[in-house]
Amino acid sequence: MSAALQWTEMRQSWRTLARRPGYLLLAVLTLALGVATTTAVFALLDQALLKPLPFPQPERLVTLGLSSDPGRNVAAPGYYPVLRRMSSLQSIGIARGFPVPANVARGAASEVVASISADAGFLRTLGLPMAAGRNFNDEESRPGGPQAVILSHRFWQRYFDGDPSAVGRTLQVEGKPVQIVGVLPAEFPWAEPFDLIRNMQPDLAATNLSTNEIVVARLRPGISVAAASAQTATTLQALLRNSPHMDASWWASLQRRPPNALPLQDSLYDANSGNTLWLFFAAAACVLLIAAINLTSLMLLRALGRSHDSAVRAALGASWLRLSLPALAEGVLIGALGSLAGLVLAWLGLRLLGGWVPLMWMRGEAPHLSGASVLFALLAGGATALLAAALGIVRGRRRNLVTELAGGGRGGWSLQAGRLGRVLVIAQVAIAVVLLIGAALFTRTLQKLAEVPMGFESRSAVVFTLAPVKERYITAADAVEQTRRIVARLQQVPGIDRVGVSTNPPTATRLSWSVEIDGASSVDSQYRLATPQFLEVFRIPLLAGRGIADSDVAGGERVCVVSASFAARYLHGQALGKIVSLPDDGGDQRVSMRVVGVVGDVRHTSPAEPPEPTVYQPLAQMSEPMWQILRGFGALTYAVHLRAGALGADERALRAAIEEVAPQQPIAELQPMQALVASTTGEQKLNLLLVGLFAGLALLLAAVGLYAVMAVAVAARQHEFGVRAALGAPPARLRRQVLGEAGVQIGVGLLLGLGVAMALSRLLQRYLFEVRVADPLAIGAVLLVLAAAGLLAALAPARRAARVPPMQALRAE
């Protein structure tokens, strides 16, 4: 068969297909939905996990330090000198890699931006060329050296319109002119987006881990991560064993956080994102599988429809290839159109998902389609369509040629084809059950989380952050005075009832600190500096003693308030009057405070996590060393409680009030406290959004598939139904028969899907909160919805079977 003849045959098949736009549209849309879901999730996977970091030889990049969260390392500047001497390293750098607020100004305009800090070795080790300017030099990385800043490409474009002459200019950073020495390349992946890098001048004698530095290193060629990890452990254990701060509690802490080396990609990004993204991909693959099953059913029915024509052509001597070309041509066209439509839907889906997927998962960038994602879509769509066409061809070859010719084209839905159709329906229903149970369980999880008391009242409260400009508010006393004046002025703004300030809002952030109880061993606790009204703004209840008072000022007795869980866990429920101590400078100096009150517990991270023991210290009593450490973490949180019935103060009124008492002091955007609380369940909402969307698509496709199979089966059995009607069978009996057959398929699919869901219970359980996979409410709802949807899909074919005119069947005889 010549190529020209093959091409003619394919074009003829496409013209024939175009004359049936309904079938073509249904097939393309079915495939597009499956391709879109898998492509969108593959794009997330590729961006987060699969695509190598754009640094030269990224497999040689590691972080060194003590294990912190799963998959993360943390280090102190004092570790840097000994780590630099490790023989396994080619280069090394240090950074404070989590963005913190920084106040920048150009002329009269000021704003808060996100900044990290790093030494010259950091960018040198990563190895990316600058878009403009240069890296920090060694002089700028020494204590007492000149200040410098490197801009992110995005900030350079926004703030300087991409002007190359911005390099060499000065930018007001924290009230001090700082020279811009370089611009980062457009693609600079990091865990969280930032606007600028400030030059870091580490104190190489400091071993305090509270500032969360990371040490990035490039391994020498041929050195494995395991070998570097072993050398890191030996080096840091020797350093820490000889530390003057090492005691039994420190040593126990070291055993829980062993020193090691971790690949940069693993230690930069959220360790939980990989598991969640693979879960999403599995769910999306289920949708593609259902779409493939539906497409197979459609193309099989299409093949059966031309079976008589194929039998005639075969009898006239047509080759197997020529008989297969129409189905293959249709598969190619449907695959191409479905892939392209799926790509468009995936692109739209990623744009809509941008605000839901954490940037930390996506290397600090918004989700987008890559070249690999486009290739994946084309391969997935093309392969699915061709496999569906191939199955139709194989099933068509099994039909008896003589029987087909004798039937005159009335052979229709054979016993074997009918059995295959039922199997495909059962498979679709089973897959839909698994996805719907997942969506129902995530819904139940969100319901349970919403019922958990956070320990504070978020209604009528708004928050914003303010970082005192460092060059104007240098000391702790300066910061306290600025805070006092701003609070006093804000309380005069109409609509504001109370104003409180703390180092952290009640939830969505953590600040861990080591606390010593009555001179005994240290314990881990959450730590907050707060003004007197902060606890009142959020109505955190006072359980015993008193709260923070206006009289708790510098020079007076140092006091603190502890949470109920702190009192119960560490003070045996007898907290009042006890003495707790905090490290004042990361070393031997400690600040002792008397416990004067006990307040209710607060869930600092999310409703899924238990309340953590917490110490609240009056902001006015913070020590100078403590302030210098804490301001490195960023800003103070101002909480404003609005009067009942008041419309509230808008952001412009707040900014104007602050400008009166603290000129050129920028603040971050105002947000309702309820929005901050809602963000604590963002991951669970993302789970529900995606799995729920996939489950809805699966339900729709399964219902369409059941309808198609039942409709064709009824059409193929019209003669049978007509004869039975002629013999006296009432329409209700024929209806019940068709619905009963559909019910059997649905029931088998439900049981099979339920069994698969139970088999996956251990995998699903990690994503649930106070809900079991075998939750009767979730399972009952899923079974009811699927059974109803399936029977509704079968209702139209059943009614058609009951309406077959008896005379039509008799005339056919």
Predicted regions and their residues:
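Alpha-helical transmembrane segments
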Residues: L33-R60, L350-L359, I431-S460, L763-V773, ...
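Membrane-helix entry/capping segments
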Residues: M1-L26, P54-P56, S67-P70, A109, ...
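Small-residue-rich transmembrane alpha-helices
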Residues: V41-L44, T296, G331-L401, R444, ...
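Mid-to-C-terminal secondary-structure elements
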Residues: S115-D138, P146-T276, R351, G438, ...
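Short, strongly hydrophobic transmembrane alpha-helices
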Residues: R20-A48, I290-A292, S339, G421-T445, ...
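Alpha-helical transmembrane segments of integral membrane proteins
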Residues: M1-L25, L264-D270, M299-L325, A329, ...
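Interfacial "coupling" helices/loops that link adjacent transmembrane helices in transporter permeases
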Residues: A291-G335, V704-I746, L750, R800, ...
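Membrane-proximal extracellular/periplasmic loop immediately following the first transmembrane helix
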Residues: F42-D46, L50-P101, N212-V216, N260-L262, ...
